[in-house]
């Protein structure tokens, strides 16, 4: 049985990237929460 995490830069950006986050209201809320917390990386 193979491991579940098979890294792919493309898939990572498409599902968790900054532009994807900005598309939905919830995603923008995530970005704002991370900004308020002072995260160095807002999105992957």
Curated annotation (Swiss-Prot):
Q: Which GO terms describe its biological process?
A: translation
- Write the signal peptide boundaries: none
Q: Which PROSITE patterns match?
A: RIBOSOMAL_L34
InterPro entries named among the record's database cross-references = Ribosomal_bL34, Ribosomal_bL34_CS
GO annotation, cellular component aspect: ribonucleoprotein complex; ribosome
Molecular-function GO terms, alphabetical:
structural constituent of ribosome
State the UniProt keywords alphabetically: Ribonucleoprotein, Ribosomal protein
Q: Which family does it belong to?
A: Belongs to the bacterial ribosomal protein bL34 family.
What's this protein's name?
Large ribosomal subunit protein bL34
Q: Which organism is it from?
A: Cupriavidus necator (strain ATCC 17699 / DSM 428 / KCTC 22496 / NCIMB 10442 / H16 / Stanier 337) (Ralstonia eutropha)
């Amino acid at each position: 049985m193979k491991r579940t995490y098979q890294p792919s830069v493309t898939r990572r950006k498409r599902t968790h990237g900054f532009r994807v986050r900005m598309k939905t209201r919830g995603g923008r809320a995530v970005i704002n929460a991370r900004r308020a917390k002072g995260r160095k990386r807002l999105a992957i």
